Amino acid sequence: MKFLDQAKIFVKSGDGGNGCVAFRREKNIEFGGPDGGHGGRGADVIVEAVPNLNTLIDFRYQQHFKAARGRDGSGDNRTGKSGEATIIKVPVGTQIFEDDRKTLIADLSRPGQRVRLAKGGDGGFGNAHYKSSTNQAPRRADPGWPGQEIWVWLRLKLIADAGLIGLPNAGKSTLLAAVTRARPKIADYPFTTLHPNLGVVHQDAREFIIADIPGLIEGAHEGAGLGTRFLGHVERCAVLLHMIDATQDDVAGAWRTVRAELKGHGQGLDEKSEIVGLSKIDALPPEDIAAKIAELSEACGAPVMAFSAISGKGLADVLRVMATHVDEARALRHARGEAEGDASDEAMRDVTGIDHGYNRPSAVVDWEDAPFDDDDDDDGDESGDKGQWTR
């Protein structure tokens, strides 16, 4: 399956159904009066995060989503059927942006989260609504209110616990294939990996997800190489394994290059927990490995873990350290979730507060049912008779 991590789609909620002009006609009832029903409400457009998807490829073939309109009202005061909501399913980790690609509408980071992108229009009033003491046979009915339409961008940021970063050919895909059942493309040339890959690691009765992203080069945050577009997929990671190829001459320079790109990308990536790893140690003699570890440790100011994804040497230690970071991050998220509560995640969120027919001027209630207004303005009839209040 092809990987696609961003897509632009058009959504339109359903229009409301039209109100009905009808009159009661039965035997021995000469003047039955109006009984036209209201139109049904248009369908909403809802986006839902589901756990069994990991790409936005489906939106390459369908970009327009239009919800059903409400059914028209009919006689005997029958309200039209409301439209059934259109559910757009997206992978967990999908962010929704406005057409400018900068304004975030929603971030669906948990399975089952929903957001209503477009609210269906109200149905129009039937003529029974307009019956009054002075107009007992109204022939007026309202059309349904139009739904909302909007263009949005979907951007997928994969949900992973740990991320693999480094220059091209640092051995990231080889490591992913060695510790998981993922089978990424592996070859001895730069930019073999063209899109992110995920795998599940099982280590000491624990499991976590790691993400392998395409390699970074100098100037990537300015668009060089494949750019930093794919760095978004490790923004949610608890820890980053920064892999440096032991066979290159300047291991300290390689570390500085990637760190500069992380800082240039922003989003706090340069502040994440980092494990510095020297890979491909099976290709060099022990004395060379020791010298490169010392050079790299001096540059980064932290311990360096040496390993080989081919021979497996040192790999278990790296995975244990990664698992420890992941466990700590999960415990922190769990404690934070208990403190804040998850009720807001379970409820469906509305994107906009735009009305689609609610509180319209034609909706009237009796004075007796209306909120009392005690200011000095003449808001209505002062005669004391039962009047009408427009909201």
From Swiss-Prot:
Function according to Swiss-Prot or TrEMBL: An essential GTPase which binds GTP, GDP and possibly (p)ppGpp with moderate affinity, with high nucleotide exchange rates and a fairly low GTP hydrolysis rate. Plays a role in control of the cell cycle, stress response, ribosome biogenesis and in those bacteria that undergo differentiation, in morphogenesis control.
Coiled-coil positions: none
Major site of localization recorded for this protein: cytoplasm
Residues the record lists as binding Mg(2+): S173, T193
Domain OBG-type G: 160-327
Keyword Secreted attributed: no
CDD domains: Obg (cd01898)
A GO CC term assigned to this protein in UniProt: cytoplasm
GO biological process assignments: ribosome biogenesis
GO molecular-function terms, A-Z: GTP binding; GTPase activity; magnesium ion binding
Keywords from the UniProt entry: Cytoplasm, GTP-binding, Hydrolase, Magnesium, Metal-binding, Nucleotide-binding
Protein name: GTPase Obg
PANTHER family with a match to the protein in the record: DEVELOPMENTALLY REGULATED GTP-BINDING PROTEIN-RELATED, MITOCHONDRIAL RIBOSOME-ASSOCIATED GTPASE 2
Quaternary assembly: Monomer.
Localization annotation: Cytoplasm
Compositional bias of kind Acidic residues: 366-382
Enzyme Commission numbers on file: 3.6.5.-
Residues binding GTP, per UniProt: 166-173, 191-195, 212-215, 279-282, 308-310
Cofactor(s) demanded: Mg(2+)
Region (Disordered): 352-391
Family of the protein in this entry: Belongs to the TRAFAC class OBG-HflX-like GTPase superfamily. OBG GTPase family.
Domain Obg: 1-159
